Amino acid sequence: MTNPISQAAGALSQDELKTLVGQAALQYVAPGEIVGVGTGSTVNKFIDALASIRHLIKGAVSSSEASTLRLKALGIPVFDANEVAELSVYIDGADEIDGHGNMIKGGGAALTREKIVAALANQFVCIADESKLVQTLGRYPLPVEIIPMAAQRITQQFAALGGRAQVRLKGDQPLVTDNGQILLDVTGLQISDPLAFETLVSQWPGVVTVGVFAYQKAQVCLLGTARGVKTLTF
């Protein structure tokens, strides 16, 4: 169901829409809690907004080194995931989200830690602009974190599904994740059953994390649109 928040957006830029949903996410942060914080440009807007209420919360669990640095720079304490039994909420963006709350994530290369923090949370609130809402996942290249020695085999397995996998580069070298592994970006997929797809790929030897979030899907999405922020619930 949808519940538009009455906040006119006018002709806002994509960056301004990100700011809008980042600020709107504060309504899901309870005083005295430790907040799960994702990674990416939209989440950066949430972190900036979170700084305005840092005196009301205990701190955050972060899904990446980049988010940790930003949180600490703004005076927000950061806890290790192993110090926290559970979180009331996890706030993160998405590269794609469908009408059931399933997502593709990992454009910021933090998908493994994002799944770990999401699994600790009782509620996943996705913040995104309306360009990320799709009918079927797969238009955005699917990130998959893998152990390097498995790259050739996993590339072949994706080819059998109609996908084309390429190692993500940073400059002329493979990008290395915060976990010391590499990423494949897979194009040409139409993921009509995200839960089954996540189950299948997660079983392949050498896969650390696949960027389909169906087991850890969103319960809420704050979607920035030309008409304001829409709240989607799943």
Curated annotation (Swiss-Prot):
GO biological process terms, semicolon-separated: D-ribose metabolic process; pentose-phosphate shunt, non-oxidative branch
Name one molecular function that GO assigns to this entry: ribose-5-phosphate isomerase activity
Query: Where on this chain does substrate bind?
Result: 39-42, 92-95, 105-108, 132
One matching Pfam family, short form?
A: Rib_5-P_isom_A
Question: Its catalytic activity?
Answer: aldehydo-D-ribose 5-phosphate = D-ribulose 5-phosphate
Gene3D superfamilies, per the entry: 3.30.70.260, 3.40.50.1360
EC identifiers of the protein: 5.3.1.6
For the keyword Nucleotide-binding, the answer is no
Keywords, alphabetical: Isomerase
Residues in the active site?
114 (proton acceptor)
The main enzyme category here is isomerase
Q: What this chain does, per the record?
A: Catalyzes the reversible conversion of ribose-5-phosphate to ribulose 5-phosphate.
* Family assignment from sequence similarity: Belongs to the ribose 5-phosphate isomerase family.
NCBIfam families, alphabetized: PRK00702.1, rpiA
How is the subunit organization of this protein annotated in UniProt? Homodimer.
UniProt xrefs under HAMAP family? Rib_5P_isom_A
Q: What is this protein called?
A: Ribose-5-phosphate isomerase A
- Source organism lineage? Bacteria, Pseudomonadati, Pseudomonadota, Betaproteobacteria, Burkholderiales
